[in-house]
Amino acid sequence: MASKAMPRAPPAAPNLQSLKLCSQNDSSLETTSPSKRSALVPGRSAESSKPNSEVVQKEQKSTQHQNESIDLTGSNDPAEVKAEGNLVPKRLADEEKGVVEDGIANGSLKSSSALGKEHGIASASGSARLVGRSETGERGFSSSRCRPSTSSDVSDESACSSISSVTKPHKANDSRWEAIQMIRTRDGILGLSHFKLLKKLGCGDIGSVYLSELNGTKSYFAMKVMDKASLASRKKLLRAQTEKEILQCLDHPFLPTLYTHFETDKFSCLVMEFCPGGDLHTLRQRQRGKYFPEQAVKFYVAEILLAMEYLHMLGIIYRDLKPENVLVREDGHIMLSDFDLSLRCAVSPTLIRSSNPDAEALRKNNQAYCVQPACVEPSCMIQPSCATPTTCFGPRFFSKSKKDRKPKPEVVNQVSPWPELIAEPSDARSMSFVGTHEYLAPEIIKGEGHGSAVDWWTFGIFLYELLFGKTPFKGSGNRATLFNVIGQPLRFPEYPVVSFSARDLIRGLLVKEPQQRLGCKRGATEIKQHPFFEGVNWALIRCASPPEVPRPVEIERPPKQPVSTSEPAAAPSDAAQKSSDSYLEFDFF
């Protein structure tokens, strides 16, 4: 076992004083050249600006090397440190220990525990994440979908940037797009000076997230601010770049929207959607018994499944699913966040038509089935009441009870009459040791290399935790947890009582052999057809009423200084006045 645990140094948070100076200086919009950006990464030479094909070939070779493994037999030398109940390689902790924020050093920032993560996007995870050595090698895996060249500097006007709602049809009617476009039309490129930082929402591994307001509007965003020097010193610049590239390509109801991004001399900033409902981990803690009812779980995991399906279609393996990374929007629907551990790879979507000859005839001759192609199972009857989406979910999400349902024609093996799109990056391979201990797949722990099947393992752990309020393989410590994942069988507690279909789905997802795991071959299509999701109308899932809608968030404004009646108040200096207009100063830790 490891020796006495050492506290893990918190990731460097941007200095608000530095943010203030950047917001006042137009030069903050300057971007680094490719040569300068390459120089920020230790050991990275001008070869970074070579064509992507050469970089990909080199980086693909590096993924063939075995990643650092965890010694499960124990060691006298402390091989890991414990941070908030999780294992972190000592090498990473030592790197992060030396990263100290300037504001803390000079006393300009005070300690505070009042800044929680109850409301926000990309909130700080309550558990540490493991990142292996070969991570920097695998990121070069190219994808055929929207992968900008890494040989040029990334600016706010990148060809793949989220610069208008035209390229994001799912957000076409979002008023925040109009606010962004209005400022851009007036001032050109957006920068840090266009936003007021109101509150710190959380602190992740590579940056801090702030609630921000676009000046002159009532539009609120979540701004992720990353210190480029800190990222370079911890060799995490490539992770930040990967997250930005992924966010640029996303357009899905249950995934984040990147409204704009920009860089200053010191910081890299991503402006995303603000989720006032917090994360599912916080929401689960507020439930009676600290677990969700099965009907609520079905709602959340169905939306997560659609988001994962979309990511796999783009050749993105998420690798970091957990309740802390699932945020709740203001309407109660979810949003998956935090993509810095994701792996990009090649994928070839395949359209497979039904192999059941009776299914096509059934679709032509029977008009009682739902006309929506996205319905996995034709359980929605076409009748006047079905025009109201809530009747397809009953109550408001699931089908009507069996006694009230009209008998439907027999479908052989429940084969869908519609074509199936299979888009599973099954050939992807990575040797990185990344993830959260209780969610790590067996193949990651063994160092055997992993692919997209790890997402379906984490999906099973996620489902288990929402239903039972705990993860299935959690041990007394991190090392015991890893042993349990590899060697212990799956067990279900007696309470709370869940349906057989829920337990059966979890059994299929938590198969230790990845080739036998549910979803390994046909991806989300295979999982959506499981009986646990019977009655879910996938085409109308956004019309369903969420289990819980968060209360409207009151945006706190900076407190006004009281004016003394006995003596005239001193006029604030121009710098102080401009500072108060730019953001609200608050404590960091």
UniProtKB/Swiss-Prot annotation:
Belongs to the protein kinase superfamily. Ser/Thr protein kinase family. PROSITE patterns: PROTEIN_KINASE_DOM, PROTEIN_KINASE_ST. It catalyses: L-seryl-[protein] + ATP = O-phospho-L-seryl-[protein] + ADP + H(+); L-threonyl-[protein] + ATP = O-phospho-L-threonyl-[protein] + ADP + H(+). GO terms for molecular function: ATP binding; protein serine kinase activity; protein serine/threonine kinase activity. It comes from Oryza sativa subsp. indica (Rice). The lineage of its organism: Eukaryota, Viridiplantae, Streptophyta, Embryophyta, Tracheophyta. The keyword ATP-binding applies. It is an enzyme of class 2 (transferase). PANTHER family: FLIPPASE KINASE 1-RELATED (PTHR45637). Gene3D superfamilies: Phosphorylase Kinase, domain 1, Transferase(Phosphotransferase) domain 1. May play a role in the regulation of metabolism and signal transduction processes. This is Protein kinase G11A. Residues 91-100 have a biased composition (Basic and acidic residues). ATP binds at residues 201-209, 224.
